[in-house]
Amino acid sequence: MLTLLSPAKKLLSISKHYSKETSNPLLLDKALQLVKIMKLKSVEQIADLMDLSKQLAELNYERYQNFDLKNNPMNHSYPALFLFQGDVYQGLNANSWKDEEIEYAQSHLGILSGLYGFLRPLDRIQPYRLEMGVNLENPAGKNLYAFWSKIVTNILNQILAEQSNPVLINLASTEYFKVVDEKKLSYPLVTINFYEQKNSELKMIGILAKKARGMMAKYIMQNRIDSIEQIKEFSESGYLFNKEISSPNSLNFIRIH
């Protein structure tokens, strides 16, 4: 099984030091094409592109200007698993993982990325911001979906082909998962959702659903889950699988308040 997450906008200023072997992003050459485009953007253009404040636009302008293309794109880089911070990654809590859990995740967990396309947990990346949904003109079209869709879908098929149970588990946001061409996926896809129930009313609350996605990914990695039936047994933070509102391709969990 391969589990997919979205990245986070918020990054740790100082990532956890990881002394064991790390990896380079599989699609680094493609990512550097986008970096070259972003290096030509002014602070104002970056602010407009991603709807950022001047302060955040200046930060990301500096990030792209300092992005090392010639000598070593891995300079000032950190494993993706430890660099991302945010609701999903609070639930994931990767700093608490054992080394063997991190090693297992390297071939069973993926992070979709606007800049890097697809990341494994130990892929070293430079701090950046580039959401998948932005309309960044590039050689492939008017947005990042045009740039990444075929490439990312192909890499997912390649990784799934190496799995003992080749099922794609989608814990990514709609914005990010749109990059996957579902018609070109060669293997089954299962999406997992989390809902809150109060007074018999079901709601998906963004911040809570994001944290739950991270908790589910942690559960799958730490327990080396390799079947849909095992996923259904997830019960952290009061979430329980609900058969009535689920289907073979959509597993829905409810927490009652």
From Swiss-Prot:
Pfam families according to UniProt: H2O2_YaaD
Species in which this protein is naturally found: Legionella pneumophila subsp. pneumophila (strain Philadelphia 1 / ATCC 33152 / DSM 7513)
PANTHER family the UniProt entry points to: PEROXIDE STRESS RESISTANCE PROTEIN YAAA, PEROXIDE STRESS RESPONSE PROTEIN YAAA
Protein name as annotated: UPF0246 protein lpg1366
Origin organism lineage: Bacteria, Pseudomonadati, Pseudomonadota, Gammaproteobacteria, Legionellales
Highest taxon of the lineage: Bacteria
GO cellular component, one term: cytosol
Homology family: Belongs to the UPF0246 family.
GO biological process, one term: response to hydroperoxide
